[in-house]
Amino acid sequence: MQKGIRLNDGHVASLGLLARKDGTRKGYLSKRSSDNTKWQTKWFALLQNLLFYFESDSSSRPSGLYLLEGCVCDRAPSPKPALSAKEPLEKQHYFTVNFSHENQKALELRTEDAKDCDEWVAAIAHASYRTLATEHEALMQKYLHLLQIVETEKTVAKQLRQQIEDGEIEIERLKAEITSLLKDNERIQSTQTVAPNDEDSDIKKIKKVQSFLRGWLCRRKWKTIIQDYIRSPHADSMRKRNQVVFSMLEAEAEYVQQLHILVNNFLRPLRMAASSKKPPITHDDVSSIFLNSETIMFLHQIFYQGLKARISSWPTLVLADLFDILLPMLNIYQEFVRNHQYSLQILAHCKQNRDFDKLLKHYEAKPDCEERTLETFLTYPMFQIPRYILTLHELLAHTPHEHVERNSLDYAKSKLEELSRIMHDEVSETENIRKNLAIERMIIEGCEILLDTSQTFVRQGSLIQVPMSEKGKITRGRLGSLSLKKEGERQCFLFSKHLIICTRGSGGKLHLTKNGVISLIDCTLLEEPESTEEEAKGSGQDIDHLDFKIGVEPKDSPPFTVILVASSRQEKAAWTSDISQCVDNIRCNGLMMNAFEENSKVTVPQMIKRTREGTREAEMSRSDASLYCDDVDIRFSKTMNSCKVLQIRYASVERLLERLTDLRFLSIDFLNTFLHSYRVFTTAIVVLDKLITIYKKPISAIPARWLRSLELLFASGQNNKLLYGEPPKSPRATRKFSSPPPLSITKTSSPSRRRKLSLNIPIITGGKALDLAALSCNSNGYTSMYSAMSPFSKATLDTSKLYVSSSFTNKIPDEGDTTPEKPEDPSALSKQSSEVSMREESDIDQNQSDDGDTETSPTKSPTTPKSVKNKNSSEFPLFSYNNGVVMTSCRELDNNRSALSAASAFAIATAGANEGTPNKEKYRRMSLASAGFPPDQRNGDKEFVIRRAATNRVLNVLRHWVSKHSQDFETNDELKCKVIGFLEEVMHDPELLTQERKAAANIIRTLTQEDPGDNQITLEEITQMAEGVKAEPFENHSALEIAEQLTLLDHLVFKKIPYEEFFGQGWMKLEKNERTPYIMKTTKHFNDISNLIASEIIRNEDINARVSAIEKWVAVADICRCLHNYNAVLEITSSMNRSAIFRLKKTWLKVSKQTKALIDKLQKLVSSEGRFKNLREALKNCDPPCVPYLGMYLTDLAFIEEGTPNYTEDGLVNFSKMRMISHIIREIRQFQQTAYKIEHQAKVTQYLLDQSFVMDEESLYESSLRIEPKLPT
């Protein structure tokens, strides 16, 4: 009997451990058992040609060993599945290992992954020792061959060295021989007689020619070497690096000058003023406004001197040590940054002092300031660190990786980027204050309401104001006329609380019009103003529904009405939607603030403030902490938005979508920023799906923390005095209304401070109005409500005249007055209600009899004509539902009077007309008025209110989206179809209110119809007309024609840029033509026009013709300046500064002094100095239409993008950055949306678009050298 082979068990175990650690292939495989019935999963490890398997990957001792030498490994086909097989064969991949021994059974293995199977087969196939030995042998043969080659080369090298040594010896011998020959030659020449003179002169000439040739050859060789280096990449990189440093020196000199003006013109004089007998400002305020300003000036003076010293040692420029000096002082900048917002707030507060404001204007009028304001100088340090980051980026781009300064510059950039992120947040948060102060400075009369730092700027633009008496006389043709444009054009500025209406005066300054400061809290917006039959006949279709009306009821002056006309339907929709949203924000703030103060002792917006005195802990515990407390997925800034809620600094996409659909408030500034920037962090479909979810499942879709806040609206069970206040002691005069009137509830204890809370009461059914104060709170609530409602089928109700008793109206602590007890008989209330109804009907009839009267009392509202009922409107505010017309109206709430409870107000605001609604549903909607109903009934009312609010929110967001961002739907058919489908589904909802259905229909109409207001020719049509047509020469067109058509072309190119291209710096990326095609087209158009102007000047051979061309183009530039086409001004001035034109000294000597002075004026206007400060001032002082220089905005966007990523390290969206970019886009779109009224002239545009004679840069310079050659030096 043959004995088994003995193996060293310990050695095998150690090899197994080595395989576990360093094996070439490891993992789980399924192995077929010896009886071919089962598959066992083992952990295999391959080490060279040894295959170990273990019970698991944690086993320390191998279960078996296979010697793979001489084996063959191949993939095996999958076997036919058995009927009882449970595992799917498509996830099993087989391979076999066949051994060379005939009686040895093949090893069958399988894996679940095809890739894993192939890798195992390849690893086993290469595990043979024989293969390794063969490869080793081949390598040894190659090694021996290379050794032979090396030996041969060594022999050859030795021979060459020997030849070189022999050559050197021969050279030395020849040198000695030459020396001896020269000595012999000198000796012979000294003994010989002197040669004839003519022979000497010939030799001298030959020598001179030889010397000249030698010098010429040397100079030519040297010139070639220099030119080769100049054209080399290294020299180009060094030139660019030096250019960056020189630009940095100029920028630093300008910045030091700005700091010098800030300190010497403002800080030091104000310190002296604070020490006077009657100081206009205190030393503490001076320190708060100018914190660290003087220290920063000293720091940069040192930095600037060091930079100048480095420049003096050019071309060796070492800059890293300069930044090493700057970096330790960054804490000074950090203190300045953190104080920046507080600084501007203190400045705004101090400007309310007339003496200080007068003194400050005196300082700002100094020539050094160049009409720049103090807040502008205070903002300059905020932009310096981003400028350093851009400079370091450019320096690093042109600094080799092995450069000694590379690491130091990288470190400086990283440190500055950390500070830059903080600065961007601070600049974003203070931008609103700076914008308000800038507008206030533009108004000659001043505007104190803009010094309120809580005001949020929303939009600005040009509108035409139409007097009421001329409403029917204005026609579309006259709207475009110069006479009405002069008389009626207004510059309108919308803020979160006010609308400012101004006229433009000389020098770009603004003048407030009469009643030009409109408080939105007193406003009623009517989008489709009513018109009588005579007015309709007079106006016809000319005005084309571009006008809207704002009714204003100030508390201390007579009411008045403002009619404004937009230039297009899109502009009108943007204005009305923003005004409506601002009014809704004020109304929501007022209602909720009053409700929370009376209901839960928590005040909105104080419920989200962390500094409220006395009730801080109670507020934080009882309100929604997610509105002000930072969390892992959201972080807040210090400033508040228009809804008095902390602005979001960073947030996740989900939290941003939550804020968009938060039913408690919707800030207009958040909404505009979100709609501008959502493409950066999400898609339109995701946003739409979120809105659809909120509409379909409002209760389950909103977070639980919202419900806790919303439930405070329904906590009226213990404070019914809010609903049933004391009766007024004197009845108020009634007013006539053809639509439902405002609900006025007043407190009679302080009649001198009485204000009205106007809410539009919805029509429940058949024109009946509901008065919540007339409803009973007992168990027979339905009966009493029905009896109270029945008389009002044709009448409307003013609750300020009602005297309602209730068992729940107790003594109000802060007034001390008592109310009568409620009658026990339920019929008493019905009787009382009927008496009230009769009084109301008599009053209404009396008012209807004097229909032509006009009410002008400060306590009364403007009459709403009957014709309003038949108007359709796209307006859909949060709390306003009238039958047939939508009006936004609100009043400031007074803390000293009783007010409507939040539950009642919310019910009134969200109920509406719905014909055919069952009585039970009507009563259920009104049950919020009674705290005596069961809890399940109140829960049902709460759900109804939330559903109405959710529907309102969805339609409101869609309205803003469709009216302001129509291009989203023009370029995305899927989104457009999905929105239309959703709105059609909404319209078929049987529970939808009439006004909600109208709002949905208006959005669909806006999506499907084209705006007929813009009939301007398109750029494509102009380009198509210019193709294949020979253009007339430059001399055939006047300067005015060229300027007008150039302005038309520039604006058509500029207005085509979609705002999504301004995100992400796509114009600086490699794929810029794909990411930002319209920005690149604008850049190409700018360069084409500049090349055209330069080519037109250069191609004139005659010097007088060139002078004439220059003067004509300068005249074109000046006309473009008058047309506010600053892009064309820069196109023309940049072409004049090109080297091919600038070097024409003879030509420029013949150009007149007036033309040269005009060129200097235009160049100063569009100069990039001070971040285009002169151009920005010109844009601020001009009215659209206008074509700004796009590069200015791209520079601003680059400053924002550099060092501030779109996402934080935690993956949160940088919403502060989105807000800053959105504000820049808002300004760009203001200029894009206002078109020029210039008639197209095909012959001129054909010349401007003709590229047949345009030369490139090199050809231009060659032609310039040909017409005026270089003068010899």
UniProtKB/Swiss-Prot annotation:
Job description of the protein: Promotes the exchange of Ras-bound GDP by GTP.
PTM annotation (Phosphoserine): residues: S577, S626, S758, S779, S800
Biased composition (Acidic residues): 842-854
Domain PH: 22-129, 467-584
InterPro entries: DBL_dom_sf, DH_dom, GDS_CDC24_CS, PH-like_dom_sf, PH_domain, Ras-like_GEF, Ras-like_Gua-exchang_fac_N, Ras_G-nucl-exch_fac_CS
Biological process according to GO: long-term memory; negative regulation of MAPK cascade; neuron projection development; positive regulation of MAPK cascade; positive regulation of Rac protein signal transduction; positive regulation of Ras protein signal transduction; Ras protein signal transduction; regulation of neuronal synaptic plasticity
Gene Ontology MF, one: guanyl-nucleotide exchange factor activity
Keyword Transit peptide belongs to the record: no
GO CC aspect terms: cytosol; growth cone; neuron projection; plasma membrane
Species, as recorded: Homo sapiens
Subunit and partners: Homooligomer and heterooligomer with RASGRF2. Interacts with USP8, thereby regulating its stability.
Stretches assigned to the DH domain: 240-426
Designated name of the protein: Ras-specific guanine nucleotide-releasing factor 1
Keywords annotated in UniProt: Guanine-nucleotide releasing factor, Phosphoprotein, Repeat, Ubl conjugation
UniProt domain N-terminal Ras-GEF: residue ranges: 644-761
Domain IQ residues, every copy: 204-229
